[in-house]
Structure formats: structure tokens, C-alpha cells
């Protein structure tokens, strides 16, 4: 039973005059072709490196990522499993190594899961993204310049930009029952 059915049944049980044509029996939906939709990135900024020096942090990343320095010009992630890191005035490309994610797991294959597990949790010790005060989120509509600004201001120590979720990934997620 989906949420709409449960809510409708609950409302019907609360209504002694239920007829079946009440508004709660309907669910408004809209459909768009997938190729007409755009999903934007959702990025992270972090206040500290969990006691690591920038060099030690970069070294720790190499366990699960291919790390390439990209210079001072803003670097946008190029594909799924590629991340942009901004640290101490430089941009880096981080590409998840094969075997660090499972292509058959619709949640485990997501860049948000990869970055949360292998960077934020494993290296930076951020276990709960919702409550940890050391992390903040920056919507992609604000651009990667906002990430750079927040790090350069000293407010944050590093920024991590993610490639947007693909439409296929979103559709795959919609098919699982969590």
C-alpha cells in the first residue's frame, strides 16, 4: 500500500460520511519526459580536516581515489564518481577507484554515498550529516564559486563538489522499497 492509499484510508476512517469522492481520495501528479529534466549538484563544505594536515588528508584520500591537482581555476566534476575538492586555494579531481562502490546497489553507487562513506565518515569522522556542525550543504544553483568563497573566507576548510545524480540513478532509486 502506498502512502497515498494509507492516508486516504486513514481519512476515510475518520470521516463517518465518507462517499469516495472526497479530495483526500485523489493524488495530484505531473509527468515530464526524463530528457526534459535537469538534476543539479548538491555540494558540501567542511569546517576542519579532523586533525589532519592538508597533506595528510590528501594522502588519506589516495586509498580510495585517484587524486589529481587541477590548479587554481574552478574545477567541476566531469562524470559520475568524479568529485572536485577545493583545499587551500587549489582544486583537485578525485575519482573513485574501481571496487570502492557497487554498481549493482542503487544506493551504494551514488556519489553522495561514496563521498559520505569514504571521505566524510572514514577520513573526516562525520558520522551524522544531519547533526554534525562541521558540515554544511551548498546547492548547485549557487555555483562552485560559492564553495571557493566559503573556503577562502576561512569559514570552511574544504569544499567537495559532486557530479549530479543521473536520471537513471533517480529512476533506479524510485523502484526500491526502503
Please give the residue ranges for each predicted region.
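Surface-exposed, charge/polar-rich loops and edge strands
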Residues: 4-176
Amino acid at each position: 500500500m502506498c502512502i497515498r492509499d494509507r492516508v486516504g484510508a486513514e481519512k476515510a476512517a475518520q470521516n463517518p460520511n465518507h462517499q469516495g469522492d472526497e479530495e483526500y481520495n485523489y493524488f495530484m501528479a505531473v509527468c515530464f519526459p526524463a530528457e526534459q529534466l535537469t538534476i543539479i549538484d548538491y555540494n558540501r563544505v567542511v569546517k576542519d580536516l579532523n586533525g589532519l594536515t592538508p597533506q595528510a588528508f590528501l594522502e588519506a584520500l589516495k586509498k580510495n581515489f585517484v587524486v589529481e591537482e587541477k590548479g587554481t581555476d574552478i574545477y567541476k566534476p566531469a562524470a559520475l564518481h568524479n568529485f572536485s575538492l577545493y583545499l587551500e586555494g587549489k582544486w583537485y579531481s578525485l575519482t573513485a577507484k574501481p571496487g570502492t562502490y557497487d554498481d549493482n546497489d542503487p544506493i551504494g553507487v551514488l556519489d553522495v554515498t561514496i563521498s559520505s562513506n569514504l571521505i566524510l565518515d572514514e577520513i573526516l569522522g562525520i558520522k551524522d550529516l544531519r547533526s554534525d556542525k562541521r558540515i554544511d550543504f551548498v546547492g548547485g544553483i549557487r555555483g562552485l564559486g560559492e564553495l571557493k568563497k566559503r573556503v577562502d573566507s576561512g569559514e570552511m576548510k574544504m569544499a567537495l563538489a559532486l557530479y549530479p545524480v543521473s536520471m537513471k540513478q533517480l529512476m533506479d532509486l524510485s523502484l526500491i522499497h526502503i
